[in-house]
Amino acid sequence: MLTKLLPDQVAKFWDIIKFAVEESLPPIIGENPDKMNRILSSILSGKTQCWASYRRDGENTTFEGIALTKVIYDDASDTRNLLIYTVYAYNISAKESWVDGLLSVVKYAAAQKCSQIVSYTSEPYLVKKAKALGANTDFTFVPFNVADVCKTVANL
C-alpha cells in the first residue's frame, strides 16, 4: 500500500526516510551540506510529498519503499507536472505493490491538475517499464557541473 505521509509521520520515520532519500537522490542535487535538512523542510512544509509503501502484519509495519514527489510549474507553457523526485525500494516488491503505488501517484497528479508525471532514472529496467506504460523515453538528461564545464571550455 502506498500512502502519502503526513508531516508528523515524516518526522516519526525520518531516519528510515532519510536513508532511502540519500540512496536515491537525483543527479540535479549538488553537494550542499544542508541538503537533507532542506529536503525535510520541503516535505514538512508540503512543497514536496513523501510517499511510503508498506506492509502491516498486526502490530508490525514493514517499509517496502519511499518516494518523493513535487508538483512543478513551467510558467512558459503554463503546465503543471508531477515530478517523481526519488524512488527507493528496500527490497524487491511484488508487482501488485508497484501497480497500486503508481495508481496512487497518478490519482494524486490528476487531483493536482498535472498534465504529466515526469522523472529521471539511470535504471534501464525502469526506462523499459516506463516506455511500456506509454512514456516518451526519447530524451536524455544531460547535467553539466558549471565549474567543470568552465574549466573544460577554457582549455579548448
Model-derived regions: residue spans:
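Active-site rim helix/loop that mediates acceptor-substrate recognition in acyltransferases
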Residues: 28-50
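Long, low-complexity, intrinsically disordered polar/charged segments
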Residues: 21, 33-34, 76-89, 106-110, ...
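Conserved donor-binding loop and adjoining core beta-sheet/short helix segment
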Residues: 45, 52-93
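Short amphipathic alpha-helix that is part of the acyltransferase structural core
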Residues: 1-35
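Active-site/acyl-donor-binding loops of N-acyltransferases
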Residues: 119-156
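Acyl-donor binding region in acyl/amide transferases
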Residues: 79-134
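A broad, low-specificity signal for short, low-complexity segments enriched in glycine/proline
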Residues: 10-15, 26, 42-45, 76-81, ...
